[in-house]
Amino acid sequence: MSSPEFGSRSFDVVVIGSANLDLVATVEHLAAPGETVIASGYAEHAGGKGLNQAVACSRSGGRTAFIGCLGRDGAGDILRGVLADEGIRDFAVDTNVPTGRALISVDEQAENSIVVVPGANHHLGIGVVDDHRSILSDTAVVLAQLEIPLDSVEAAFAVARLARAITANKTA
């Protein structure tokens, strides 16, 4: 993405955002309040809107970096492995809080029910943004989403805009 407008930057895209381990149960139908259902299948996947954005950007050929917060736990190790395997520069911060999780039930009609446990994602504060100012200033685009604190998104975008980077926020 080297162009006169963006000059020579280290990254095409920096994503600041969430990373979760998705725990997915396949069920015949979604549970009603108070009902217990038996799953016919189970899988774990890397997830979180931020991590998903970073993977998509990297797979599209962009030089991609990820800034987020992970726990010092097995889920954090799995997600760091995904970042490495996908060729994404990992600037994730370790926390003493468990890595975020999403508990997902998917029924036979592909309808789902999701409970998100933010965990470490909610510890992505202004301090993390400040610690990564040089990364946020050395990219053409900064992507974010609202699975991390809003004040951190605003601070990251302020840094990026000073460096004349494009900013984009996925609100849903």
Over which residues does each language-model region extend?
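Beta-strand->loop->alpha-helix junctions that form or flank phosphate-binding loops
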Residues: 16, 40-44, 67-72, 87-100, ...
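Short active-site-adjacent helix-start/loop capping segments
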Residues: 23-25, 74-77, 99-101, 113
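A broadly tuned preference for mixed-charge, low-complexity surface segments
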Residues: 63-72, 149, 153-157
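Short glycine/serine/threonine-rich phosphate/pyrophosphate-binding segments
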Residues: 49-52, 75, 98-100, 151-153
